[in-house]
């Protein structure tokens, strides 16, 4: 105390503290001096994880209303940028797409996809460009999708027949969700593996595998965000579940690979790139690339498995979810359903089957699906990206290594872009100026930029055909005199957000 009362010493200490303060101000990290996006208060260790909730797209939308369309959260020790406006999405997925095109490392996706050798989770780089090119040019091109159209038509025909049989055998309401999930599984399985592998037993295994994948991909892995807590996975059972699921997927796909290779060897079959119309399945195409029969492309065995599993996990769930929400909105809006009935039946003109040409004339069908996907994008929070360098976005500094989440669900309901945003109004798309391809950033149900969904054309083709055939063949009403406005539209939690309860309706076959 006496030392502090010494005027000379006090002056010297004051000067020293001032110099230290000045030094810190002058030489502090540039990041500290730069303007960063607004953030809600965070807790020690967990950061903002406690604010995410079971439906994160809704929680993050709520936070964005308070903190802005570009906000910075912390999930554990990881900075996470959340974009909730079209302007912010455009900055990330168009203006600075290359900087934000990689994926953050994920323990779960790494284990399920052979070290992220698939398309969805692979980090941005030469390998990702190669596998995406294979998917776009060899598996999911417009020509390839057309060559698989007979599969879509056959499987939807089977679905219609099965619903008819169910209506004949029982007057009870029909669980439409059961029929549509079976449909999407069958279409993807036949396209990926060939019809031989889509018998009842294999479909049971595939359905169980997909359910497991979907569940575990939605699990929070503490080690990804709080590295020193990674050991917890051993005690929660996550590591064990993950190992079993990865083995289950590997054994299933490996069995299909072995069968295809034996058959190709015995029959001398090979993929002819000049003849896209052949009934070749995805596995045949990928194995020809693996065996060096397609010039300019190369894949190892694990990559073949990872890409095939991508087709299942990405394709089945998103397509089924889109169909399911469309049916729900039609049941909830009888006047829209009536208008769609009229269009489909006028275009079909009494024919027993709807053709591809017919679908091209169904303008109202297309806007019904667009409006459904505006309100219910299958993956509301687009798969996370990661910044590869320091960058400035909308006047804010974003550090390299920041994870980025684009809230497509919030953007699709933003009243700044959508009049009466919470209402289901297909007519808003009738001017035809907006599509799914990610050019309009107020509407990005399938993402945009380099990381947009490569299966977009295929997914929309399946959804359109399914809804058109259901509306063509059946009339639907809610059971027990239920009021449309009372239909439960509660969402289930998950990476892909389903309707929590299945769509159940009274179904009556029409005379065409």
From Swiss-Prot:
CDD domains assigned: CYP71-like
Coiled coil: none
Chain ranges passing through the membrane: 3-23
PROSITE patterns: CYTOCHROME_P450 (PS00086)
GO cellular component: membrane
Taxonomic superkingdom: Eukaryota
Primary location recorded for the protein, binned into one broad class: membrane
Gene3D superfamilies assigned: Cytochrome P450 (1.10.630.10)
Cofactor annotation: heme
Alphabetical list of InterPro entries matching this protein: Cyt_P450, Cyt_P450_CS, Cyt_P450_E_grp-I, Cyt_P450_sf
GO MF assignments: heme binding; iron ion binding; monooxygenase activity; oxidoreductase activity, acting on paired donors, with incorporation or reduction of molecular oxygen
Involved pathway(s): Alkaloid biosynthesis
EC number, UniProt record: 1.14.14.188
Keywords of this entry: Heme, Iron, Membrane, Metal-binding, Monooxygenase, Oxidoreductase, Transmembrane, Transmembrane helix
Topology in membrane: Single-pass membrane protein
Any one Gene Ontology BP term: alkaloid biosynthetic process
Pfam families for the chain: p450
Tissue: Mainly expressed in roots.
Sites where the protein binds heme: 453
Compartment annotation: Membrane
Catalyzed chemical reaction(s): norfluorocurarine + reduced [NADPH--hemoprotein reductase] + O2 = 18-hydroxynorfluorocurarine + oxidized [NADPH--hemoprotein reductase] + H2O + H(+)
Signal peptide: none
Role description: Monooxygenase involved in the biosynthesis of curare monoterpene indole alkaloids (MIAs), natural products such as strychnine, a neurotoxic compound used as a pesticide to control rodents, and its pharmacologically active derivatives, including brucine, used to regulate blood pressure. Curare alkaloids act as animal glycine receptor antagonists. Catalyzes the conversion of norfluorocurarine to 18-OH norfluorocurarine.
Family: Belongs to the cytochrome P450 family.
Name recorded for this polypeptide: Norfluorocurarine oxidase
Gene, per the UniProt record: NO
């Amino acid at each position: 105390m006496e030392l502090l009362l010494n005027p000379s010493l006090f002056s010297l200490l004051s000067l020293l503290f001032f110099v230290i303060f000045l030094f810190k101000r002058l030489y502090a990290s540039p990041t500290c001096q730069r303007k960063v996006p607004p953030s809600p208060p965070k807790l020690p260790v967990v950061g903002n994880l406690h604010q995410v909730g079971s439906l994160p797209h809704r929680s993050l939308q709520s936070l964005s209303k308070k903190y802005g369309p570009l906000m910075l959260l912390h999930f554990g020790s990881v900075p996470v940028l959340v974009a909730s406006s079209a302007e912010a999405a455009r900055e990330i997925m168009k203006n600075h797409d290359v900087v934000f095109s990689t994926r953050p490392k994920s323990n779960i996706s790494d284990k399920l996809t052979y070290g992220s050798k698939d398309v969805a989770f692979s980090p941005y780089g030469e390998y990702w460009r190669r596998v995406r090119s294979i998917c776009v040019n060899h598996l999911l091109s417009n020509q390839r999708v057309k060559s698989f159209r007979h599969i879509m038509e056959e499987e939807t025909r089977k679905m219609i027949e099965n619903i008819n049989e169910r209506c004949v055998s029982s007057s009870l309401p029909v669980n439409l969700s059961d029929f549509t999930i079976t449909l999407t599984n069958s279409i993807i399985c036949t396209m990926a593996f060939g019809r031989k592998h889509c018998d009842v037993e294999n479909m049971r295994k595939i359905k169980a595998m997909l359910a497991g994948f979907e569940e575990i991909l939605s699990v929070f892995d503490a080690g990804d965000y709080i590295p020193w807590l990674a050991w917890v996975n051993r005690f929660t059972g996550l590591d064990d579940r993950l190992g079993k699921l990865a083995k289950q997927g590997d054994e299933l796909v490996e069995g299909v690979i072995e069968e295809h290779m034996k058959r190709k060897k015995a029959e001398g079959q090979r993929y002819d790139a000049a003849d896209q119309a052949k009934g070749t399945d995805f596995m045949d195409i990928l194995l020809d690339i693996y065996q060096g029969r397609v010039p300019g492309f190369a894949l190892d065995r694990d990559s073949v498995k990872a890409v095939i599993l991508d087709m299942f996990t990405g394709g089945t769930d998103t397509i089924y979810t889109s169909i399911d929400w469309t049916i729900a909105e039609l049941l909830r809006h009888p006047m829209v359903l009536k208008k769609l009935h009229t269009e489909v039946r006028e275009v079909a003109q009494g024919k027993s089957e709807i053709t591809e040409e017919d679908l091209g004339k169904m303008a109202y069908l297309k806007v019904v699906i667009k409006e459904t996907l505006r309100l219910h994008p299958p993956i509301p929070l687009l798969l996370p990206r990661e910044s590869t360098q320091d960058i400035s976005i909308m006047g804010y500094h974003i550090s390299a290594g920041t994870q980025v989440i684009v809230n497509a669900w919030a953007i699709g309901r933003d009243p700044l872009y959508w009049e009466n945003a919470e209402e289901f109004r297909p007519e808003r798309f009738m001017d035809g100026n907006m599509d799914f391809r990610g050019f309009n950033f107020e509407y990005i149900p399938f993402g945009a930029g380099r990381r947009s969904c490569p299966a977009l054309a295929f997914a929309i083709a399946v959804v359109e055909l399914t809804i058109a055939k259901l509306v063509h063949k059946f009339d639907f009403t809610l059971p027990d005199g239920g009021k449309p406005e009372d239909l439960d539209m509660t969402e289930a939690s998950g990476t892909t957000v389903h309707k929590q309860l299945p769509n159940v309706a009274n179904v009556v076959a029409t005379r065409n």
